[in-house]
Amino acid sequence: MTNSVLVLGAGIAGMRAAAELVQQGFEVYLLEKKSRIDNNWESIDHLFPTDECAACSLQPLLLELFNNANAKILTSTELLSLRGQAGDLTAEVLKEKDEDKGGSKEVLSVGAVIVATGQEEDKGETHEHLGYGMQALAERLGLELDDKGNFKRDLENGHPLLTARKGVFVCGGGLGPIKIGESVVRACAAASQAASLLVPAKRNGLTKPEENHFFPVKAEDEPRIAVVIDQGDADVKDLLDLDELATYTQSLPGVEQVELTARASDGSSIKDLIGTGDFNRLIVAGPSPIPHEGLFQRHAAEADLNPYLLEMVNLHNQCARVHSSDRKQATEKAKTLMNMGVARVRQLEPLEELKFDITQSCLVIGGSISGVACAVRLAEMGINVHLVTSSPEQEKIRESDHPLIKPLPAKLSNSENVIVHTDAAVEDSQGCLGNFIVTLNQPGEPETLKVGAIVLASAMSIEKGGDGSPLEESLALEKDSDGFYKSTQGIMNLLDFTTEGVFNCGAARTALEIEVAVLDGEAAASRAACILSSPSITRSPVISLVVNENCDGCAYCIDPCPTRSLTLLEYVHRSAVKKVAEHNKVTCIGCGICMSTCPKKGIFVKHFRLETFSEMVKTALKASDFQPSIICFCCSRCAYPGADAAGSMGIQYPASVKIIRSVCSGMIHPNIVIDALTQDGADGVLLCGCHPGNCRSREGVLKAQARTEAIDLMLEDFALEPERFRLEFIAASEGKKFAKVIEEMTEELSALGPNPYNKT
């Protein structure tokens, strides 16, 4: 049996199915006929009906696939044939090179295939029948079409994702026209089907990260910086005087070597430089850190440099392309950006990925159709399950004659991986992702369970049922006006809650027909399996850290934390009661909202310290030759990609703006804004974040918005005009809007005149 899955089609369903499977320990080939995997999304601005930014919603999927060595992305590639049996299939594919050279054939060994091909709107052309590509694909897959032009189902149980050929599953547009949210759910369900089939081979032959032996680097070591400048593609390499830029960069403090390279992304120049052991910091100048930072961090790690000692300077999208009409001006700005990059990399410290052991079992609350389907699917994926249900729910499942439900009771009773808790109710939950401690109130003695994930499939099995129950409070659950639990991660994650490791499906989230309820449960099983398929989880070290010496226990940071990662701790220190914030490393997402609320510098985010922001601001303004000078803070999720979008489209805007990337707009402390204006002499400060409702940190942009009033009052105290500070919501697709905002703010600041606090 082969631990590989071939996913046909890299649309939203294909990417989601692929991302699910690589997280669960499978190798994935993501095959796309077109030249790029996100090809159609450039034409989509916002998603209906939630009005989410399409590019912002897509970004996490792209990063998951780009940054996972077990995801093999095959673009400009078509399937020619599929032979063999489920678990041991051979797929022949044709990868196109160009029109003159033709293509090259390749044979892939896979255990299963997920068909996630999309659909296109009719262009008014004449066709013999709709779905004109389906017949050819069906023949290559060894399938037949039904009278509606869809793939024939497995006749044994009529499951909508199972085709007549075992080991070949279908989701997305392959099922017909379907809404985005439903397509995502079906993609997760299809992934669970493939994972169940290939359980015996899971994790076999995976590309595992090599054990790193990084050069020892201490924070106090004098920086020895190597700089690699990527010349870029033909459209950018002549827009900057790169020789002049390299000479200038060589003169900056701590820079010991600068190299120009035609393409830094292959990693060879980085490995040659860093591999000598002569350098303890690295700057890659050229590509955007989104989505390239993960790639260059891997190159750094392969050369034995801690990946968090890397800084990226965005010359292509945020300098060359947006100032292409004036090469000299663009080159001067590039020098400033390099200076800012050096200022930041000098302050970086080596960090280690965080690894936590987890409990590889799942609690499913509710014996609804979705709950039972979820429990059965998890068990078939090799994961231990505790199913909390009631006698009426069990009876209803047993009495059903529906072909999808009828086999479920027997599968439950025959599985060694499922423990059913009948007529029990979940009273409370403590802990967090990977290690929840749950109390069951059941006939006889109460029972305490330890699980790694929780799936809600019904509201009926929750003690005290209504809003405000201990479980709802501990898991931060919220109900809508109809009494269903609200999923809070947007249309791309209908089954996810704000609290990581807790998922929503079936009767807990909405009313569903039987077939859809089964898919909902299977999809939730896939989401939980992404956590539970490994005995440990690895998290980014870019999280908050409490400075006990500075923290006075004011608790200003506690309530604003969107993940409830902070609590107040009291203890006796030197015969006195000491209060200090205590931090949960597992649940922290590094948004920095806590850092921006602290008046005493008692907490900071690793890799994004306040001092680093301040130093970059000083450097940007010290080297600035353009007036008025604008410091622009952009969040990584939406606004920074939005600025990149302006570069991709070649939209011009004034070179007076210098962009500084932050994790979230909510991490920018008001003092940074005021200091930039009153001490460093910026003419204006622009803070760009996600649109409300699209914030990865849930509330970060709302916190930033709430602080604008305080910033306005501080500006008034310093006799500065309110126009010198501006907050804007920029989606990842809104490059035109970003450029327009820069134009408008530059005009406003020009009318106001120079900042009176500018000492130069």
What residue spans do the PLM features occupy?
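C-terminal functional segments of enzyme domains
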Residues: 730-760
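Short Gly/aromatic-enriched secondary-structure transition segments
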Residues: 647-649
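Residues forming the flavin
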Residues: 1-629, 635, 640, 652-665, ...
